[in-house]
Amino acid sequence: MNLVQVNIKSGGYLKKDLILNDISFAVKSGELVGLIGPNGAGKSTILKTVMGQLPYMDGKIDFPNAHTHYAYIPEQPVLYDNLTLWEHLEFAAAVGKMSRETFVSRAEELLKLFRLYKEKHRLPVTFSKGMQQKVMLILGFMMRPALYIVDEPFIGLDPHGMRDFLQLVDQVRQDGAGILMSTHSLDTAEKICTSFILIHEGTIISQGNLEAIRQQSRLPEGSLFDCFISLLEMQS
């Protein structure tokens, strides 16, 4: 089942300065779709378009189920200066109309998983970048939406944090959620994504599972990195 269908003819922050062209894809239940490309390729702009945050867009973003909820986990943590970690979680639960019992259970489980339980009454603005990234992951996964939109989740995460994130990804996929994740960490993406959308200068240069990407790049046994470089060379 499609959780979101994206058809962007063009898009940008100004109508006269378009960044995206001919972007079409879907994210299905149980999928982890990797939005792959270098810095400045348009990955974050695509995510903003999916969420309706791009000032100009010619196209359509369709959520087939009108009741589909999504969680957005940004690359840069967004935190309140005067709220403790626990108060951040309480605020998110209140916005999501989560019962107190469900909130406490999920919050404590995630805090323990990411080894932040002892820090729950501290101010996250004083945390390291990696710890702040874990806070954003906890906030997103606590809500258990049907769709996760994740922007560069690996930046700042230590190996334990990355393992915990990947464990949660597997769990929510098994529960039927879909994930759209942007990253330029091709080695990790190759291991965990079910399909890929390769972006260059705001345009899709290839998409599909790894086998399809290999066929399109004419590298039958190539890594995702090698395939991406080959496709870029074909564009030039």
Say what each PLM segment does.
Residues 1-6, 10-22:
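A short, flexible loop at the N-terminus of ABC-type nucleotide-binding domains that lies
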Residues 148-152:
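Catalytic Walker B motif of ABC-type/P-loop ATPase nucleotide-binding domains
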Residues 51:
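Helix-to-loop junction immediately C-terminal to a conserved catalytic motif
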Residues 123-130:
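Conserved ABC ATPase signature
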Residues 90, 94, 101-119:
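Conserved ABC ATPase "signature" region
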Residues 36-38:
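The feature captures the beta-strand-to-loop junction immediately N-terminal to the Walker
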